[in-house]
């Protein structure tokens, strides 16, 4: 059974466009800006200018959204602003207007994914052959990282005995594409979930039952030969989905036509690998965090991770406050300044709470048992790969991620076959995210992700003509709104 599935580009449409301010003064280059990864910017400017580390200082300013769009691109305009200030001796500020931001900045990679599945005489899956093509745009950028995650997500949550996968990022004459929430996984899950739905219909089985019967479980092997090391709570998620929706996922209402409109339900399962893909945390990032207890009893968190509207500061402060057993108000966390904070890694890939939060937890335990009240003391903690997480980057064999979150989605949709208008009438989702460090922050992240997913599937369109997007403003670049 074969199928081909495609997705388009998606604009981040963060509320605040890209912007940088650079100042070269007394041999020191300081750059302020809207960014997710201050050390990415610093590490880009160091070879560009040939300066020593102490001559470049990057300060993140309050940032109005990112979603991956302010991961690597800020380094480009930081370089432009920095060069201007270096040459003129005056401060230089570059703020992109909206149409320029849409024109220049990376988008979610468009994709074309083909899946071919072999079944035995009892309709059991024998294997899959998958081809993944993503549109990288004019330069590689983060395409290799996006391609890896798409590759590792390509068989979804399913137990596939044999798989052969070809994955390519193609150079084209469009804007370079880059990171965007999930970076490769949404494209892959759209393909595999649609394919499994169509496959179930082809063999005349209920799609939800077919998906559940083929789902991986605790102890099973992953696509890359790793192991599912934690309980898979799919049955519990399905039970909760039934409770909150009032609908039995295994017996969903059939498609119906009423008043000339089609009403139907869609269902999907997913898992998401947490943190950097493969050996990124171990070999590239090597995150370092510090905690400093001041003489007045306050404790300052020293990390490079940024608050971009996702609630990172609240979450990290809560981790430290609760571990130390002190009031939340005594924990200080300012926007990062590379002259003061260590490189704890980028604010990407759902790693801030899990990786950096855990490092801060361990640092707080150290601090709790050191020094006396009124004494200034600094402790640090560096990331070390757990010995049970084994990965070979050369062969792509082992545990591509240290842990997974799991989820179910159920959507009720109404479509008008004459006007092609689609309305999402209801949406329900259940997610296994472990222990939420802050329930309001976690709920906000889930709500935001759902909204972006619905928008990507329904109203968000980027039309490309000769390498340029026709959509140029927030008026014609439509996204879901309240």
Regions found by a protein language model. Give the residues of each.
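Short Gly/aromatic-enriched secondary-structure transition segments
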Residues: 440-444
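Structural alpha/beta core scaffold segments of enzyme domains
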Residues: 1-430
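Glycine-rich active-site loop/lid that clamps phosphate-bearing ligands
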Residues: 261, 273, 281-282, 461-482
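Cytochrome P450 core scaffold surrounding the K-helix E-X-X-R motif
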Residues: 434-438
């Amino acid at each position: 059974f074969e199928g081909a599935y495609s997705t388009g580009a998606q604009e981040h449409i963060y509320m605040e466009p890209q912007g940088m301010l650079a100042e070269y003064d007394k041999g020191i280059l300081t750059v302020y800006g809207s960014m997710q990864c201050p050390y990415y910017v610093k590490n880009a400017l160091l070879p560009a200018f040939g300066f020593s580390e102490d001559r470049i200082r990057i300060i993140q300013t309050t940032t109005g959204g990112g979603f991956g769009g302010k991961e690597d691109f800020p380094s480009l305009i930081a370089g432009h602003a920095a060069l201007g200030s270096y040459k003129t001796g005056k401060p230089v500020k570059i703020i992109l207007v909206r149409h320029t931001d849409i024109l220049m900045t990376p988008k979610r990679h468009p994709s074309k994914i083909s899946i071919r599945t072999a079944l035995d005489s009892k309709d059991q899956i024998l294997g899959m052959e998958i081809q993944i093509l993503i549109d990288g745009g004019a330069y590689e950028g983060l395409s290799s990282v996006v391609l890896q995650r798409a590759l590792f997500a390509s068989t979804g949550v399913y137990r596939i005995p044999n798989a052969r996968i070809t994955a390519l990022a193609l150079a084209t004459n469009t804007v370079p594409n880059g990171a965007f929430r999930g970076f490769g996984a949404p494209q892959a899950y759209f393909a595999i979930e649609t394919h499994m739905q169509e496959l179930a219909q082809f063999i005349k089985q209920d799609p939800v039952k077919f998906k559940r019967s083929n789902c991986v479980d605790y102890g099973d092997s992953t696509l890359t030969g790793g192991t599912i090391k934690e309980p898979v709570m799919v049955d519990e998620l399905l039970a909760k989905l039934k409770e909150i929706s009032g609908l039995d996922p295994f017996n969903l209402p059939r498609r119906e036509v009423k008043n000339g409109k089609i009403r139907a339900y869609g269902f999907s399962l997913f898992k998401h690998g947490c943190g950097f893909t493969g050996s990124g945390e171990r070999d590239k990032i090597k995150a370092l965090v510090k905690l400093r207890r001041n003489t007045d009893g306050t404790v300052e968190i020293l990390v490079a991770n940024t608050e971009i509207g996702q609630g990172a500061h609240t979450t990290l402060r809560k981790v430290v406050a609760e571990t130390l057993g002190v009031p939340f108000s005594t924990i200080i966390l300012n926007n990062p300044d590379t002259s003061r904070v260590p490189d704890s890694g980028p604010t990407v890939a759902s790693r801030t709470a899990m990786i950096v939060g855990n490092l801060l937890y361990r640092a707080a335990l150290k601090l709790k048992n050191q020094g006396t009240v009124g004494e200034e003391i600094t402790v640090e903690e560096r990331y070390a790969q757990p010995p049970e997480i084994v990965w070979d980057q050369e062969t792509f064999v082992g545990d591509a991620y240290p842990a997974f979150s799991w989820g179910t989605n159920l959507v009720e949709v109404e479509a008008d076959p004459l006007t092609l208008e689609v309305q999402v009438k209801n949406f329900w989702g259940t997610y296994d995210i472990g222990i939420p460090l802050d329930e309001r922050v976690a709920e906000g992240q889930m709500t935001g992700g759902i909204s972006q997913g619905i928008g990507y599937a329904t109203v968000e369109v980027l039309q490309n003509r000769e390498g340029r997007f026709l959509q140029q403003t927030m008026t014609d670049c439509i996204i879901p709104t309240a």
